[in-house]
């Protein structure tokens, strides 16, 4: 240009950005409950899977494709007691749960032979949700009793079913290893997501391959 002015002094700001994943469904539970294996079983994701806690240190995303639906599923790293106080990086993980519409609470049936301890897995995560953001308790839930192939005590299965009926939360038993219950879980996810659509004007999510 033939004419230019010096202009005004610019502004400088330092910003701290907080990342929160947006997903239709979030898989939550204690460490080593089998969430990553379930994600692999129901979606196109291929997360790292190991036989020890805290294998997943950041959320994994997968796309569950059913007919013309594309449902984004997030595998949230395991939550422990004190997560709401940032134990085990809990606050970092809980932030991602806030942006999900439906929560799937995965219980590890192989972790103990005690029904009370399995129920305690449910209570721990619920308590941390309540301490962090009570609105999380109002989300639609599906409870998954995972690793059913390793459960020998039928009384635990019956007792957990009775307990979840009292809680008025749908329960399904699955095995990511053998495939038991996986089709049923997918059906429950599709139905629940359909009943709780995204708010109008929200971001449209598409498969990375589209």
Question: PLM features: residue spans?
Answer:
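Conserved G1/Walker A P-loop phosphate-binding module
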Residues: 1-87, 91, 95-102
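C-terminal-of-GTPase-core extension/linker across diverse P-loop GTPases
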Residues: 3-4, 10-33, 39, 67, ...
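Generic enzyme active-site microenvironment
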Residues: 73, 106, 144
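Inter-motif core of Ras-like GTPase G domains
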Residues: 88-113, 129-136
């Amino acid at each position: 240009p033939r004419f230019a002015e010096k202009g005004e002094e610019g502004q400088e700001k330092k910003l701290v950005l907080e990342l929160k994943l947006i997903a239709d469904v979030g898989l939550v539970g204690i460490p080593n409950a089998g969430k990553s294996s379930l994600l692999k079983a129901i979606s196109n994701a291929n997360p790292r899977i190991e036989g020890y806690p805290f294998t997943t240190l950041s959320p994994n995303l997968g796309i569950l494709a059913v007919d013309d639906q594309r449902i984004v599923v997030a595998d949230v790293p395991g939550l422990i007691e004190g997560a709401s106080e940032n134990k085990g990086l809990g606050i970092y993980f809980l932030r991602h749960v806030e942006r999900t519409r439906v929560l799937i609470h995965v219980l590890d049936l192989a972790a103990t032979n005690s029904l009370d301890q399995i129920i305690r897995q449910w209570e721990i995560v619920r308590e941390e949700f309540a301490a962090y953001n009570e609105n999380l308790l109002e989300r639609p839930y599906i409870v998954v009793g995972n690793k059913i192939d390793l459960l020998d005590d039928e009384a635990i299965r019956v007792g957990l079913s009775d307990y979840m009926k009292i809680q008025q939360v749908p329960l399904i038993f699955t095995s990511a290893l053998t495939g038991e219950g996986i089709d049923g879980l997918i059906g429950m996810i599709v139905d629940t997501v359909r009943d709780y659509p995204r708010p109008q004007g929200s971001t449209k999510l598409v498969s990375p391959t589209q």
